[in-house]
Amino acid sequence: MNKFDEFVEATDKELHVDTSTRNTTINVSSPGSSNDSTSSPKSPSGEVLSRKEMKMKQFTPKKLNYQDHPLKDHSTGGSLPITRRTSRSSTIHKRKSLLQPIVAPQTPDKSGPSWRSNGGSPSGSFNRQRSTSGASMHSRSSSQSLSLDSTFDVSLQNLANKELELLESKRRIEELKKQLQLEEQSYQKRVEELKELKSQVSNDLQINSQHQQQQQQQQQQQQQHHLQPHSKKREEHTRDKSRGKGSGTGSSSVWSKPLAFFNQFDQIIQHELERSLRWDDTPEDKIMQPEPYEGAAAVQNSQLRQPQVEIPTSNSQSNVNNTDNNDNKINNNTNNTSNNKNGHDDNNNNNDSSNNNNNNDGNNKNLWSFFNDVKTGLLGIEEEEETPQRTIAGSAKNDNGIKEFKTAKKTRDPVEMTDFQK
């Protein structure tokens, strides 16, 4: 409820008036006529008529006459009887509110106004009529109806707005569906175009690759045709060079190694001659003679010296003869190698590379045989060359066939004899 309705109900309770209906009449009695008004008339059927049930016709506002003007001077009266009517101006300034009419009692006029009684009631109470203007006839029912109307209008507006929103959403959904269909169609078209482009590109690549392969094959064939004579010439040239180098290197390798061997042999021979002739010994040590050796034992005991009671001249002469024989052998072998070298050169000029290899093998065999001869001559492995004159005083054999040598230390002290067994 509104505050206005509460105010209306409160005033109705105070005045004992029901303002829910508009066509109601209120009879207000004066104090003098209170007794008369208390006695309510009874209907023939025995029902008591209350004040609230007494109705008055609704008056419409009319234009006031000059006589009804409130500022008119009533002292200068005429012969006409003055009839006083309840005016709106007399009650409007006594109201508490502009919207709620207030009923106030009115004293009777001395001039004897004519009162109208509703239904011919004999009571002398003053009847106050309620104003029936549109502004003052506001009631609780009208406020309730207005509130209901306002809520109904609001609900209708909300309903209409919701329906419009739903329609707009449907329209948008349809538009989006159409857009999706268009996008799908465009996508399918693009996919087809892409497939076509791929097929075109693959075909172009295959054609280009085939052309490139053909061009490469043609270029390779042309290069082979151009390079075949050059390659043949180069191969022939390399073969010639290899043959020349093989002959040169073969001869150089064949004759460089024997020369080195010859130098080594020469040094070994000189060393052995010096040891055999005792060029490094002093005259006092000439008594100490080297013991002759037999095989490898002679090499180990070459540094051992032993005294000899009798120094035969045949030993020195045999040693000198052996050295001369060795020198003669070396000279003969060198001559043979030089002859072989000359023959090898002639064969290189006349024969092919196969003959050169055979000659090289033969030369190597000759050189190794010469090396073996020199070795046997230097080390004295052959025992047939030994003569019975090369016996040493003091040498003897045991029962087991082992030779025993008596040697002395190389000192100026008296000779100390020591026994060595072999």
Swiss-Prot record:
Residues 29-45, 131-148, 210-226, 314-341, 348-366 have a biased composition (Low complexity). GO terms for cellular component: cytoplasm. Residues 15-148, 203-255, 309-368, 382-422 are annotated as: Disordered. Residues 85-97 have a biased composition (Basic residues). The keyword Nucleus does not apply. It comes from the Eukaryota. Residues 114-130 have a biased composition (Polar residues). Belongs to the TDA11 family. This is Topoisomerase I damage affected protein 11.
